């Protein structure tokens, strides 16, 4: 959001267009879609929504200790559409939002059942509340913790950690690959399976009944590959620096998704204080790469970028 204001308010004064910078800063593959005809109007509308949600969140915190993590993991463009049309149907009509909410509810319900079934939380209401908060925090990459979920049973810690990579929507405050990219990848896989069974069938990749251009599909696949390669490189570098496999994997994922807590000594009950300078620099690089959506960082190392 900060770069959006910079592109709208500062660059025009310098005679430099801000549209490309805003496009680079906006998360998600559908960056060509504009909510309003002008970049300034789009930035203004998104900031009104952002500040409005922040103000409501402050009031809700004060009155009832509520949190808005799940709301902020949805696409802010959907908030804009719902606000403009005075209707909540915009959320239901969005495949990405439905998948995000469905994934959240399934994770929360499964986690709550596991905590209650294993006796970790004997009270059903406490199990549900703790699970709900943990899933909302990890899925939205907020990083808050009301319990040390790294010690929960049935592989729940790994599921929660991986949820930080896929549940948040594009155009939200969350990190990771984003749900829209995951939906496009699965749609592309379905397209390939259909082509194998019916070679002459015409089955375009679609999201919300709209055909996704091949340019965007290839961009999503490239992004997913580079994202996974960056995370794997981080894991290998951390392993080489002396970290344990569990902590290397969790710290790398937690950093590139901007989640924060990982597993083991870097879990919700721990911190990164004991790590060496080399390990902290590796994780800092992953945080920067993940926050700026990869290509924005990697293009700086391209020789063509610096050519006049």
Predicted regions and their residues:
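Membrane-proximal intracellular helices of multi-pass ion channels
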Residues: 1-308
């Amino acid at each position: 959001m900060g770069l959006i204001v910079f592109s709208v308010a500062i660059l025009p004064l310098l005679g430099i267009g801000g549209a490309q910078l805003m496009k680079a800063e906006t998360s998600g593959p559908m960056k060509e879609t504009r909510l309003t005809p002008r970049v300034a109007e789009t930035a203004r509308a998104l900031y009104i929504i952002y500040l409005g949600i922040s103000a409501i969140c402050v009031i809700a915190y004060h009155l009832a200790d509520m949190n808005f993590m799940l709301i902020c993991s949805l696409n802010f463009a959907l908030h804009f559409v719902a606000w403009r049309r005075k209707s909540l149907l915009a959320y239901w009509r969005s495949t990405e939002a439905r998948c995000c909410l469905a994934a959240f509810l399934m994770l929360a319900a499964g986690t709550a059942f596991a905590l209650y079934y294993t006796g970790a939380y004997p009270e059903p209401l406490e199990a549900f509340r703790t699970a709900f908060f943990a899933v909302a925090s990890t899925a939205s990459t907020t990083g808050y913790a009301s319990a040390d979920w790294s010690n929960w049973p049935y592989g729940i810690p790994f599921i929660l950690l991986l949820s930080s990579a896929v549940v948040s929507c594009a155009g939200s405050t969350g990190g990771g690959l984003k749900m829209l990219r995951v939906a496009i990848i699965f749609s592309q896989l379905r397209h390939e399976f259909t082509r194998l069974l019916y070679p002459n069938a015409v089955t375009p990749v679609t999201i919300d009944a709209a055909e996704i251009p091949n340019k965007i599909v290839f961009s999503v696949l490239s992004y997913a590959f580079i994202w996974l390669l960056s995370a794997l490189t981080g894991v290998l570098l951390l392993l080489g620096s002396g970290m344990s496999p569990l902590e290397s994997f969790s710290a790398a994922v937690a950093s590139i998704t901007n989640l924060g807590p990982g597993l083991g000594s870097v879990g919700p009950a721990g911190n990164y204080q004991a790590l060496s300078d080399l390990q902290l620099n590796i994780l800092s690089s992953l945080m920067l790469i993940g926050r700026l959506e990869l290509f924005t960082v990697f293009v700086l190392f391209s020789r063509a970028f610096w050519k006049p």
